[in-house]
């Protein structure tokens, strides 16, 4: 079966020297990820893999089946999805996850959940209704107070306004309680702050009206949807939705640290002009906290029609302060020309749309564009709205907006510019082009190219996958570590530089000097103390003793005087006789020694016993669970491959046989399974030739997909091993084994696909910086490919991970195509596979063009 984690990564174009561009070679780069950690863990633990089924990683061991009964397994699987990691850990340790019977716990949990949901639903309804009623009453109260300034002194009109307001309050409350969306059920959590009231009173009118016009473009500006019976309910619902939406947005950005600053620092002329514009627009639209209601006595059709331009200006200016995520990210509005001092003096962050002089993410080019727009438009509109000439206080720049008609609203709203990480592949092709493809992890050598191609003048890589650099960072490409040069600092003193000796070297020097001293001199000299001798001769396993010895001893050994009646060991042979099992040397202390030596001897013996126990524990840890077979233990190089036996063949314990070369030359089973799946899914093929079958790793996987396989190898021993392994997997009847040389048999063969996996020369192939497929293979890699082309153009070339990609691409020939697939095993680059002919998987765009 083909690997699930497979993707096209890049397209590489290689241009041939002294050839036209039409002869370039297209190399499609892809990656396939397979996992076999379970198989590797099975090899480390020494578990037996059952023979039923093909995927051994999903099987359990015989020991696990014996321990768990079927009933326990069913109960565990039923509740597995409801357990958190801690509960799973407790279950794996045999501890109870919960107390009481399962049925009781389940029924109690269901009933409690139903009660809690009902209570929460009732609370939400109650709080929502109370909260809406309070907000609507307060806003209508403010509305009535403002209307008192506009309406006439006739008490009948005031009474009529109050009655209408009361009726509208009741109808609005009922309508909002019914038509409120589901997302507004959390309204009680939104707090109406003073900043929000200022913001809504200043900009809510424009937001509501702009959204209403976008929603119903057919209605004229002179209409009053809040008073018309046909649109009154729609307007109330529209108001409720926008109010809660912008309140939620406002509180979100306020929690992020943004602050709203009212436009109080503007120039007098600018502020005056805006005031006049607001006064002119007041007759058409009355700003309040809840609706855009206006008195019939003051709202006239003539004023509405004449002030359309001013109304559009208000809407365009209000768009600056919409706290939407797009505009906050864009933040390229410039208000520095309108203000005496920048608002950066305000502590904390400021919303870029509220007049901040510095943009958060905008580039200098974007800010210049917005300056040209904003500096040109208001100067013209100030002359239209007020009689005073205010353009002399502001610089006037020539722009293209001056030629627009007077009816068009000023273009203050910034356009949404995508960042580099938001661009699609086709929108910014320059950033996706690379000349060397460093992030792909390929090796480019200078070896001879196939088919007489001199060399490649340049290569061009276009990445098809986003964040290739970031993703490649977490993949093990098996690159060589670059070691930085060390900077050696020499001291200014002319004396001999100090060279620090290692601990082991100083110990050896002390021991050899002490052992080689003459016996006569040792008797005449003062004896060593017992503690010093023990510190000098003990093993180097204990780091604490090493530290104490460094503190007390220098490069030369110091000796403490003791009484003359205390004798020392006469020769090194006696020391060796007294050597303990743990590897430490203990001096024998005679009875006539000083009392200090006798007092210290029990302590030394206790330390020696502790060391023995520690070393025994270490030896027990290093012991393997299952001993290596004799044939593996006799060859040290194969010891690490024994732990990987289930990665090579999941049914290893069923009778798989390998020779010495087969251990490190066979393809891991998961990679072989992926290659076989790709071949079977590419096109309808019947016969596959495995030119160098070895012990049958790839041959068996091809046969498991239902294909007929011709397995060829020049070594009769490997043919016998491959036949045995095929019988273990039950596919021997689908394979025809031929013992012979592929170079001689190739002209006589006919097949749909040829799989090439020639010997790589042993494990030493990985030590080379770049693997030359022509000189490092035996037989020649170019000759093998040439003979395979006589059989079919559908060729699979299995190569080392450090193979020269330029050589592999040259196999496609001028104007040809090849797909180079990187095979990752547990996120480690293991091998690469080159596909030719109909086996190439082309991207969707390429296949559509073809």
UniProtKB/Swiss-Prot annotation:
Biased composition (Polar residues): 375-390
Extent of Basic and acidic residues compositional bias: 363-374, 548-562
Localization per Swiss-Prot or TrEMBL: Cytoplasm; Nucleus, Cajal body; Nucleus, Nucleolus
EC number: 2.1.1.-
UniProt keyword annotation of Transcription regulation present: yes
GO biological process terms, semicolon-separated: 7-methylguanosine cap hypermethylation
SUPFAM superfamilies according to UniProt: S-adenosyl-L-methionine-dependent methyltransferases
UniProt keyword annotation of Cell membrane present: no
Modified positions (Phosphoserine) in chain numbering: 92, 152, 405, 431, 571
Compositionally biased intervals (Acidic residues): 424-435
One term of GO molecular function: RNA cap trimethylguanosine synthase activity
Tissue-specific expression: A 55 kDa isoform is widely expressed while a 90 kDa isoform is detected exclusively in brain and testis (at protein level).
Binding site for S-adenosyl-L-methionine: 713
Superkingdom to which the source organism belongs: Eukaryota
Catalysed transformations (reactions): a 5'-end (N(7)-methyl 5'-triphosphoguanosine)-ribonucleoside in snRNA + S-adenosyl-L-methionine = a 5'-end (N(2),N(7)-dimethyl 5'-triphosphoguanosine)-ribonucleoside in snRNA + S-adenosyl-L-homocysteine + H(+); a 5'-end (N(7)-methyl 5'-triphosphoguanosine)-ribonucleoside in snoRNA + S-adenosyl-L-methionine = a 5'-end (N(2),N(7)-dimethyl 5'-triphosphoguanosine)-ribonucleoside in snoRNA + S-adenosyl-L-homocysteine + H(+); a 5'-end (N(2),N(7)-dimethyl 5'-triphosphoguanosine)-ribonucleoside in snRNA + S-adenosyl-L-methionine = a 5'-end (N(2),N(2),N(7)-trimethyl 5'-triphosphoguanosine)-ribonucleoside in snRNA + S-adenosyl-L-homocysteine + H(+); a 5'-end (N(2),N(7)-dimethyl 5'-triphosphoguanosine)-ribonucleoside in snoRNA + S-adenosyl-L-methionine = a 5'-end (N(2),N(2),N(7)-trimethyl 5'-triphosphoguanosine)-ribonucleoside in snoRNA + S-adenosyl-L-homocysteine + H(+)
Region entry Disordered, spans: 54-85, 278-311, 327-454, 523-566, 595-628
S-S bridge residues: none
Function in brief: Catalyzes the 2 serial methylation steps for the conversion of the 7-monomethylguanosine (m(7)G) caps of snRNAs and snoRNAs to a 2,2,7-trimethylguanosine (m(2,2,7)G) cap structure. The enzyme is specific for guanine, and N7 methylation must precede N2 methylation. Hypermethylation of the m7G cap of U snRNAs leads to their concentration in nuclear foci, their colocalization with coilin and the formation of canonical Cajal bodies (CBs). Plays a role in transcriptional regulation.
Protein name per the record: Trimethylguanosine synthase
Source organism: Rattus norvegicus (Rat)
Biological classification of the source: Eukaryota, Metazoa, Chordata, Craniata, Vertebrata
């Amino acid at each position: 079966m083909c690997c699930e984690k497979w993707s096209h990564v890049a397209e590489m174009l290689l241009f041939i020297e002294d050839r036209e561009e039409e002869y370039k070679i297209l190399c499609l780069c892809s990656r396939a990820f397979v996992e076999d950690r379970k198989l590797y863990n099975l090899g480390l633990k020494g578990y037996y893999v059952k023979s039923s089924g093909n995927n051994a990683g999903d099987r359990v061991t015989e020991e696990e089946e014996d321990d768990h009964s079927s009933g326990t397994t069913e109960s565990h699987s039923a509740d597995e999805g409801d357990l958190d990691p801690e509960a799973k850990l407790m279950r794996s340790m045999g501890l109870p996850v919960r107390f009481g019977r399962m049925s009781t716990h389940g029924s109690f949990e269901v009933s409690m959940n139903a009660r809690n949901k009902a209570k929460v639903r009732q609370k939400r309804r109650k709080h929502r209704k109370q909260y809406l009623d309070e907000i609507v009453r307060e806003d209508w109260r403010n509305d009535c107070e403002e209307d008192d300034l506009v309406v006439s002194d006739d008490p009948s009109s005031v009474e009529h306004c109050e009655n209408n307001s009361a009726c509208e309050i009741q109808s609005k409350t009922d309508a909002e309680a019914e038509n409120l969306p589901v997302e507004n059920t959390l309204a009680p959590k939104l707090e109406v702050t003073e900043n929000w009231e200022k913001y809504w009173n200043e900009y809510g009118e424009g937001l509501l009206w702009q959204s209403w016009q976008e929603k119903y473009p057919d209605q004229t500006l002179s209409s009053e949807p809040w008073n018309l019976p046909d649109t009154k309910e729609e307007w109330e619902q529209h108001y409720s939705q926008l109010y809660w939406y912008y309140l939620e947005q406002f509180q979100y950005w306020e929690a992020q640290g943004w602050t709203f600053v009212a436009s109080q620092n503007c120039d007098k002329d600018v502020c005056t002009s805006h005031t006049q514009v607001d006064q002119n627009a007041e007759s058409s639209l009355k700003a309040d906290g809840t609706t855009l209601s206006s008195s019939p006595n003051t709202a006239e059709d003539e004023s509405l029609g004449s002030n359309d331009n001013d109304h559009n200006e208000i809407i365009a200016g209000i768009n600056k302060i919409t706290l939407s995520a797009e505009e906050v990210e864009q933040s390229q509005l410039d208000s520095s020309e309108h203000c005496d001092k920048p608002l950066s003096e305000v502590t904390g962050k400021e919303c870029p749309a509220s007049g901040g002089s510095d943009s958060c993410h905008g580039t200098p080019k974007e800010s210049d564009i917005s300056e040209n727009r904003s500096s040109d438009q208001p100067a013209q509109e100030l002359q239209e709205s007020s009689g005073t000439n205010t353009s002399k206080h502001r610089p006037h720049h020539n722009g293209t907006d001056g030629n627009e008609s007077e009816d068009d609203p000023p273009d203050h709203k910034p356009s949404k510019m995508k960042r580099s990480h938001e661009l699609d592949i086709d929108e910014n092709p320059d950033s996706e082009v690379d000349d060397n493809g460093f992030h792909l992890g390929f090796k480019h050598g200078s070896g001879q190219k196939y088919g007489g191609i001199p060399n490649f003048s340049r290569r061009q890589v276009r990445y098809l996958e986003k964040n290739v650099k970031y993703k490649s960072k977490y993949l093990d490409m098996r690159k060589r570590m670059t070691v930085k040069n060390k900077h050696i600092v020499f001291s200014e003193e002319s004396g001999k530089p100090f060279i620090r000796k290692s601990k082991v070297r100083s110990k050896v020097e002390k021991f050899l000097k002490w052992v080689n001293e003459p016996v006569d001199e040792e008797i005449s000299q003062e004896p060593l103390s017992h503690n010093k001798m023990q510190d000098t001769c003990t093993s180097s396993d204990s780091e604490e003793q090493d530290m104490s010895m460094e503190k007390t001893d220098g490069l030369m050994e110091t000796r403490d005087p003791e009484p003359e009646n205390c004798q020392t060991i006469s020769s090194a042979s006696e020391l060796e006789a007294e050597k303990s099992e743990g590897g430490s040397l203990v001096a024998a202390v005679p009875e006539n020694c000083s009392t200090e030596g006798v007092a210290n001897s029990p302590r030394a013996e206790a330390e020696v016993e502790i060391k023995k126990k520690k070393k025994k524990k270490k030896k027990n840890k290093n012991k393997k669970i299952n001993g290596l077979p004799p044939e593996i233990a006799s060859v040290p190089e194969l010891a690490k491959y024994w732990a990987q036996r289930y990665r090579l063949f999941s049914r290893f314990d069923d009778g798989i046989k390998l020779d010495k070369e087969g251990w490190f030359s066979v393809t891991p089973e998961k990679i072989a399974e992926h290659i076989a799946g790709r071949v079977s899914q590419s096109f309808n093929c019947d016969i596959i030739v495995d030119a160098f079958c070895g012990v049958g790793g790839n041959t068996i996987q091809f046969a498991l997909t239902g294909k007929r396989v011709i397995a060829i190898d020049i070594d009769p021993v490997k043919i016998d091993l491959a036949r045995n392994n095929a019988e273990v997997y039950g596919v021997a009847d689908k394979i025809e084994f031929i013992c012979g040389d592929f170079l001689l048999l190739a002209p006589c063969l006919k097949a749909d696909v040829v799989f090439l996996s020639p010997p790589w020369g042993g494990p030493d192939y990985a030590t080379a910086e770049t693997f030359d497929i022509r000189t490092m293979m035996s037989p020649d890699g170019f000759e093998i490919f040439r003979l395979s082309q006589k059989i079919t153009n559908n060729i699979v070339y299995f190569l080392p991970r450090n193979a020269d990609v330029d050589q592999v691409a040259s196999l496609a020939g001028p104007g040809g195509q090849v797909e180079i697939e990187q095979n990752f095993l547990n996120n480690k680059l293991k091998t690469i596979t080159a596909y030719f002919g109909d086996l190439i998987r082309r991207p969707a765009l390429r296949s559509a063009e073809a």
